[in-house]
Amino acid sequence: MCCDISKTLCVKPFIDPEEEISHRVSFLADYLRHSRASGYVLGISGGQDSALAGRLCQIAVESVRSIGFDATLWAIRLPYGQQFDESDAQTAMQFISPDEELSFDIRSATDNLCVDLNRSLGSKISDFNRGNIKARLRMVVQYAVAAHHDALVVGTDHAAEAVTGFFTKFGDGAADILPLYGLTKGQGRALLKALGACDSIIEKVPTADLLDDLPCLPDETELGLQYRDIDAFLEGKPVSEDITMAITERYKSTLHKRMPPITPHSTWWRK
């Protein structure tokens, strides 16, 4: 089962960071030219994933410009009010060095929507539900910016998130292009190191930071799994039976998040 999942998610047990950088930058540049879009739009949180995706995109658009085409990276900060780790986000922006920086505070949109929802439902929605609203509003903003500039939205999904379904459906799971697809969390760190990222970016504790009640809750706490174990599972390395079962069950239970909407012709859900 482990091998089948890894193959489905395009995970390699070993990578050459420099080769992966070259391959993924070329992919971004080639697809941008093919699509005839004006560039890429990416939300920047301050974490490892958006920093890596952002830097790859910036190198790609510069490559496209070097051969005479217009191309821009719009990097967007999308805080909910005052972000606890705002300094990390600014460090990530400096590392990415995007062509254009934008900022949009989603707090008023989130709060107003939730007030109206609570009134309509007659009860207060959960903090988890509210967190998913934040993720989806962030994607609404990114697609609005992309539509304004005729650009493409970049997602940061990678293998460790994909296998666990650790993303918001139609939130951060929505995108036009996924340059980190197939990478484990540790492989992403290796690419950041090869790109010259500072230690604070590479070693930053991963957090979705969507919950009001538990700000900056580490991903590993929320998942109940360590990324090193998820990576080992994906790379075909030995892990305990309990970990194998936990990851496999999460993979199965979140399959709907990795599939298009179900139709009368869909059969995967019956298996």
From Swiss-Prot:
Which GO terms are recorded in the biological process aspect for this UniProt protein?
A: NAD biosynthetic process
Q: State the EC number(s).
A: 6.3.1.5
Instruction: State the reactions this protein catalyses.
Output: deamido-NAD(+) + NH4(+) + ATP = AMP + diphosphate + NAD(+) + H(+)
* Keyword NAD among UniProt keywords: yes
Key word Plastid present: no
Q: Name one GO cellular component term.
A: cytoplasm
The alphabetized UniProt keywords are:
ATP-binding, Ligase, Magnesium, Metal-binding, NAD, Nucleotide-binding
Which GO molecular function annotations are given, in alphabetical order?
A: ATP binding; glutaminase activity; metal ion binding; NAD+ synthase (glutamine-hydrolyzing) activity; NAD+ synthase activity
Q: How does it assemble?
A: Homodimer.
Which family is annotated?
A: Belongs to the NAD synthetase family.
UniProt name for this protein:
NH(3)-dependent NAD(+) synthetase
Q: Which organism is it from?
A: Tropheryma whipplei (strain Twist)
